[in-house]
A protein has these predicted regions:
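Active-site signature of alpha/beta-hydrolase-fold catalytic machinery across serine-
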Residues: 219, 278-283
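Gly/Ala-rich beta-loop-alpha elbow adjacent to hydrolase catalytic centers
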Residues: 268-269, 273-277, 300
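Flexible, membrane-associating and regulatory peripheral segments of lipid-active enzymes
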Residues: 17-22, 30-73, 77-80, 86-204, ...
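Active-site catalytic motif of lipid deacylating hydrolases and related acyltransferases
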Residues: 197-264
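Structural recognition of the beta-strand scaffold that forms the well-ordered cores
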Residues: 203-206, 230-234, 266-267, 295-299, ...
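Bacterial N-terminal signal peptides
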Residues: 6-15
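Helical cap/lid subdomain of alpha/beta-hydrolase-fold lipid enzymes
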Residues: 282-417
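Positively charged n-region of N-terminal signal peptides that target proteins for export
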Residues: 1-4
């Protein structure tokens, strides 16, 4: 048995002696709870208007919804209880369907196997002189569902928190790896604020890495100019596929944009968080969304993947979904840089080269080799590169890192409302 697999099993044992069993059970629960639905949206009456895709049960009660900035491709997670979709353009921004707004109903298959995606759903929205029949559309405001990922799973959108709270403890990070569904059901995932929202401060979104929490950024956040910027913290179960995490992040940002109307946002990501952020930005580019993103700063990110993830896919008794995304030869990483960054977004790469690993002679930060941090395709699209004599975690505590991140932020003046 390869040495890496023995290490993975040891990690699982340290996580609770039943790590792989927990993962197997949790992934089954995930498949039983969530269905992916995707397709395209056409809206000739208002090509620039936001669209809400609402999942309804058999009685026409709304279960969850997702906001899209404009027509094009859509992808939504729904509960197996979902029997219908109702899609409409929220012309007056009240998060409710009103007569005269373009819409399109759709009935989902009466039986869709657990975990099997529903694809190829192409919908054309159009206005009608009379409202659709009762029970086919959501009646009333949908604001109460704004924090809901799917039925029974709520996320945090703008909840004010402190980094020393128990929800950000390392044990929660471990849950996010080995029991991602339990993490979601516990209501831990979402975008947290460290202070009440201020329209006069530019948001800086911090995205942690695998087995991490927002607390990892405590010292870096303390170095940010809080008179000009407001930290936002994305918290997610790091055991899931990276594209799924990136899509969820886009949904949350679109929801906050609909509510807060912010014009600018900067992204600062550590480790695997850089891959999550790059996945988000690829979707933004392909769907012409996220015009509010100004800069993307990645810190010690494995853009070339991790051989450990590949070995986990090949040898582990249960495969953690994120390992497929992190496998160097896998489709996710192979295509990661085939899509250019969105227009106007600069990528700044910060990397560490202090190797503190006693069992590795590979150059890097003790966790991520340099050839992964400095993948050529990433360098080609980067606006700047900056290296530090720090390891994988100490780079977040470095005063030099904080100084440079502040410099990146200050180079981009905020847009006028």
């Amino acid at each position: 048995m390869p040495r890496l697999l023995a290490l993975l099993i040891l990690i699982a044992n340290l996580a609770g002696c039943t790590g792989f069993l927990d993962l197997k059970h949790d992934l089954k629960t995930y498949q039983d709870t969530i269905t992916h639905v995707s397709g395209t949206l056409a809206a000739p009456d208002c090509p620039s208007c936001a669209i809400l895709v609402v999942a309804l049960d058999k009685q026409g009660q709304p279960l969850s919804y997702k906001v899209f900035e404009h027509p094009g491709r859509f992808d939504i997670l729904v509960s197996p209880r979902a029997a219908k979709l109702f899609v409409f353009q929220d012309i007056n921004h009240d998060i409710a369907f009103n007569p005269g707004e373009p819409y399109a109903p759709h009935t989902l298959p009466s039986a869709h196997p657990d975990g099997t995606p529903l694809t190829g759903i192409d919908l054309k929205l159009s206005a009608a002189s009379s409202p659709p029949p009762a029970g086919t559309y959501p009646d009333g405001n949908l604001f109460a569902l704004r924090n809901r990922l799917v039925a029974g799973i709520d996320v945090q959108l703008g909840s004010v928190a402190k980094l020393n709270e128990a929800r950000f403890d390392p044990e929660r990070a471990s849950m996010g790896m080995w029991q991602p569904m339990q993490f979601l059901k516990a209501g831990l995932s979402g975008i947290y604020f460290l202070e009440d929202y201020s329209p006069n401060k530019t948001p800086v979104l911090f995205v942690h890495g695998i087995n991490g929490t927002p607390r990892d950024f405590a010292e870096l956040v303390s170095r940010i100019d809080r008179n000009t910027y407001q930290p936002w913290l994305f918290y997610y179960p790091s055991g899931l596929e990276i594209p799924t995490i990136g899509d969820a992040l886009l949904n949350m940002l679109n929801e906050l944009r609909q509510e807060r109307h912010f014009n600018d946002l900067h992204i600062v990501a550590h480790s695997m968080g850089g891959l999550v952020s790059r996945s988000l930005l690829n979707t933004c580019r392909l769907e012409s969304e996220c015009d509010f993103v100004r800069t993307f700063t990645s810190i010690s990110s494995p853009f070339g993947g991790a051989q450990a993830a590949k070995s986990g896919v090949e040898y582990a008794p249960v495969v953690m979904p994120v390992w497929r995304s992190m496998s160097p030869e896998g489709p996710f990483l192979t295509d990661l840089f085939s899509t250019p960054l969105p227009a106007g977004v600069e990528h700044h790469i910060l990397f560490g080269f202090r190797n503190v690993a006693t069992l590795s002679a590979t150059s890097g930060d003790g966790t991520i080799p340099l050839d992964s941090q400095l993948r050529h395709a990433a360098q080609q699209q980067a606006a700047s590169l900056r290296g530090y004599d720090e390891d994988h975690l100490s780079i977040l505590r470095s005063e030099l890192t904080g100084t440079y991140v502040n410099a990146i932020l200050s180079r981009v003046p905020p847009r006028q409302p």
